[in-house]
UniProtKB/Swiss-Prot annotation:
Protein's gene: MAO1B
UniProt binding sites for Fe cation: H177, D179, H234
Gene Ontology BP, a term: ethylene biosynthetic process
Reaction(s) this enzyme catalyzes, per UniProt: 1-aminocyclopropane-1-carboxylate + L-ascorbate + O2 = ethene + L-dehydroascorbate + hydrogen cyanide + CO2 + 2 H2O
Pathway annotation: Alkene biosynthesis; ethylene biosynthesis via S-adenosyl-L-methionine; ethylene from S-adenosyl-L-methionine: step 2/2
Organism of provenance: Musa acuminata
Known EC number: 1.14.17.4
Domain Fe2OG dioxygenase: 153-253
Keywords assigned: Ethylene biosynthesis, Fruit ripening, Iron, Metal-binding, Oxidoreductase, Vitamin C
Family matches, as InterPro entries: DIOX_N, IPNS-like_FE2OG_OXY, IPNS-like_sf, Oxoglu/Fe-dep_dioxygenase_dom, Plant_2OG-oxidoreductases
Cofactor: Fe cation
Protein name: 1-aminocyclopropane-1-carboxylate oxidase
Signal peptide: none
Length: 306
């Protein structure tokens, strides 16, 4: 079993209807799919690989003294059979428009700004496809994420590396969770695997595919679609060989945006009852920060009570 791979270039051709249907299936049945021929230049993706790898090499010594490494060393020395269940074997930093970026390598900032602009455009195009498939007005999801245009949506890029791990039996690369926000676009390593998503009780590998962009839907897309699209559990397994690169961009609501099931296109049938509460996304994030690695349903109930 493998997650869907969709040729995004066919969206603008004779196979548009079939491509729209495949994306709908990816959102409804999987919550994960891979896009090829998505429009981001391969030359840019090659530069992103280069600068992110060079950046990690400059940070590698810092990771060797990090909390996960120290905790694992202590656990191995004590040898009491416990696992590291509260940390991830991951070196990570987040890029936003207004925060401090690494100054080295010298071309890191220019390259990543160019990439973020391209991946943001792809995210917004994907949201318009979701709008159409769900029967929403064009721009509905983006408008909801911006609080009816009052606040800019959040757009952050998480740059991660998963170094080789000496004890795979004791720690995960990234613990299982669903993503809190909207649409997530991942440019993952095309050599070193490890990403898995949960479907029908089975963990499925998200196979490395050169120059593809992995799309997954977050909790807020589940709410806006009133459960038609589900956020999927996923995790990253640590590996004993290779250094896995992972660049995930998150197109999320503003913390001030109010999220609730959206009204679909007008039909003769009565709208289904809302299965999710109406809430402020900032309140949801407060709950998520404490319950990220726990089932999502209690999070929805918690914000219902606020």
């Amino acid at each position: 079993m493998a997650i869907p791979v969709i040729d995004f270039s066919k969206l603008d051709g004779k196979e548009r209807a079939e491509t729209m249907a495949r994306i709908a299936n990816g959102c409804e049945e999987w919550g994960f799919f891979q896009l090829v021929n998505h429009g981001i230049p391969v030359e840019l993706l090659e530069r992103v690989k280069k600068v992110s790898s060079e950046c990690y090499k400059l940070r590698e010594e810092r990771f060797e003294g990090s909390k996960p490494v120290q905790l694992l060393d202590t656990l191995v020395k004590e040898g009491d059979g416990q696992r590291l269940d509260n940390v991830d074997w991951e070196d990570v930093f987040v890029l936003q428009d207004d925060n401090e970026w690494p100054s080295n390598p010298p071309d890191f900032e220019e390259t990543m700004k160019e990439y973020r602009e391209e991946i943001r455009k792809l995210a917004e195009k994907m949201m318009e496809v979701m709008d159409e498939n769900l029967g929403f007005e064009k721009g509905c999801i983006k408008k909801a994420f911006s609080g009816d245009g009052q606040h800019p949506p959040f757009f952050g890029t998480k740059v991660s590396h998963y170094p080789p791990c000496p004890r795979l039996d004791l720690v995960k690369g990234l613990r299982a969770h669903t993503d809190a926000g909207g649409v997530i676009l991942l440019f993952q390593d095309d050599q070193v695997g490890g990403l898995q998503m949960l479907k029908d009780g089975r963990w499925i590998d998200v196979q490395p595919l050169a120059d593809a962009i992995v799309i997954n839907t977050g909790d807020q897309i589940e709410v806006l679609s009133n459960g038609r699209y589900k956020s999927a559990w996923h995790r990253v397994l640590a590996t004993s060989h290779g250094n896995r690169r992972s660049i995930a961009s998150f197109y999320n609501p503003s913390l001030k945006a109010t999220i609730a099931p959206a009204a679909g296109a007008a039909t003769e049938e009565a709208a289904p009852p809302a299965l999710y509460p109406k809430f402020l996304f900032g309140d949801y994030m407060d709950v998520y920060a404490k319950q990220k690695y726990e089932p999502k349903e209690p999070r929805f109930e918690a914000v219902r009570a606020i």
